[in-house]
Curated annotation (Swiss-Prot):
GO molecular function: magnesium ion binding; phosphopentomutase activity
Record keywords, A-Z: Manganese, Metal-binding
Similarity section: Belongs to the phosphopentomutase family.
Gene Ontology terms: cellular component: cytosol
Species whose genome carries this gene: Escherichia coli (strain K12)
Protein's recorded name: Uncharacterized protein YhfW
Keyword match RNA-binding: no
Cofactors required: Mn(2+)
A GO BP annotation: metabolic compound salvage
InterPro entries referenced in this protein's UniProt entry, alphabetically: Alkaline_phosphatase_core_sf, DeoB, Metalloenzyme, Phosphopentomutase_DeoB_cap_sf
């Protein structure tokens, strides 16, 4: 009986990927962790420090130092860009495929027709570039925070329209388009005009709502991510189900990863609540895989708010200490990220960064896991840990973990 926890601190990268000068020059020099610690050198994250955060970062920009007891590595992104949805699919064993890129303007006609046919009131807003405005409460257009052309947003005022109805609109859009992701989200706004006032265009081809400016994150935020072309049958939850091991997803990962046979805690944003649920699930199940996402760090990155990012990291760190304290000798923990979102880089998009892979189990001897070429190595390790069939992608590093008393 054992538990394996993967905690994903959303967007907590540790340095730009080597290929950014070619594929994402706007991310050159990005380092989410490093630049936060440079601006706040006295920030203390003692649990992450012990687990090897500074080891993974590769230098000490503040008071925190490398750990002599850590098992750590870094992982490169195999998916293009830097994306939460594809990052988590990759973590859980999907081999990423090149995404379809298409501005919303290229599909606006058929999306509009499908919505009108389904009985929704649809207007076009904008001049040469246009987005859709549905039932005076929902905007549909390009996602301006992710890689342009890969994601469409449905931004709703949930004071006017129910989230269930917003999801119905999102599903109609999903049926009409082939981009990697459609995100339906909203918040409780006093005036729908706030969404319209946050409309922006980029590069003369993309138009949508600036999500942080819309106010959707501020009060009553809810979100569902609708993916394209991801096969849940080759992912970790399915493989563990075949081996009789339950999967628990907590936070944003539950919104974006299919888990039909397990427990999914969806529509959660508050970091403390997410960590409380994680610890409760950990204490409830003698055997389980638990994957938790901390989204508020990513939201702080989008808002380019270093102080907020650091404060959320402290919440995570305090609760990680509780989790480590509750662990038994057979339990394993991995702390990692899915991409970067450097709040100092000068734009509000994700940044393409390598991520830390920090591993803890009682009795473990300090080990360097090196550079993993895909996030899927974590999912492959989870499957081997539980003696389950491997996922589609990734190489397990379980055999690299060393413990006191091991013989060569």
């Amino acid at each position: 009986m054992a538990r394996f926890v993967v905690l994903v601190i959303d967007s907590f990268g540790v340095g730009a990927m080597k290929d950014v000068t070619l594929v994402r020059p706007q991310d050159a020099g990005a380092n989410t962790c490093g630049h936060i610690l440079s601006q706040l050198p006295h920030l203390q994250l003692p649990t992450l420090e012990t687990l090897g955060l500074i080891n993974a970062l590769g230098y000490a920009p503040g008071d925190m130092q490398p750990s002599d007891s850590a098992t750590w590595g870094v992982a490169e992104l195999q998916h293009e860009g830097g994306d939460t949805f594809m990052g988590h699919q990759e973590i859980l064993g999907t081999r990423p495929l090149p995404p379809l890129r298409m501005p919303f303007r290229d599909v606006i006609d058929r999306v509009e027709q499908a919505l009108v046919s389904a009985g929704w009131q649809v207007e076009r807003r904008g001049d040469d570039l246009q987005f859709l405005w549905v039932n005076q409460a929902v905007a549909i257009g390009d996602n301006l925070e992710a890689d342009l052309g890969q994601v469409y947003n449905i931004t709703a005022n949930l004071s006017v329209i129910s989230f269930d109805d917003a999801i119905k609109i999102g599903r109609i859009v999903r049926e009409q388009v082939q981009v990697g992701r459609v995100i339906t989200f909203g918040g409780l706004l006093t005036d729908s005009q706030r969404i319209l006032d946050a409309a922006e265009s980029k590069e003369g081809r993309f138009i949508g709502i600036n999500a942080p400016r819309s106010g959707a994150y501020d009060n009553g935020f809810q979100v569902v991510h609708m993916g394209y072309g991801v096969d849940e049958k080759v992912q970790v939850p399915q493989k563990l189900y075949e081996a009789g091991v339950p999967t628990v997803l907590v936070g944003k990962v539950a919104d974006i990863v299919n888990n039909p046979y397990g427990v999914s805690w969806q529509n959660l944003v508050d970091s403390q609540r997410i960590m409380d649920i994680t610890l409760n699930e950990f204490n409830t199940h003698p055997t389980a895989f638990i994957c938790t996402n901390i989204q508020e760090t990513d939201l702080a990155g989008h808002a380019e708010d270093v102080a907020r990012y650091a404060e959320r990291l402290q919440v995570v760190d305090r609760n990680l200490a509780r989790l480590v304290e509750a662990m038994q000798p057979d339990d394993c923990l991995v702390v990692m990220a899915d991409h970067g979102n450097d709040p100092t880089i000068g734009h509000s998009h994700h940044t393409r960064e390598v991520v830390p892979v920090l591993v803890y189990q009682q009795g473990m001897i300090a080990t360097q896991l090196g550079v993993r070429t895909t996030l899927s190595d974590v999912g492959a390790t989870v499957c081997e840990f539980f003696r389950a069939p491997p996922p589609q992608n990734g190489r397990s590093f379980l055999s690299s973990l060393r413990f006191a008393g091991d013989t060569l």
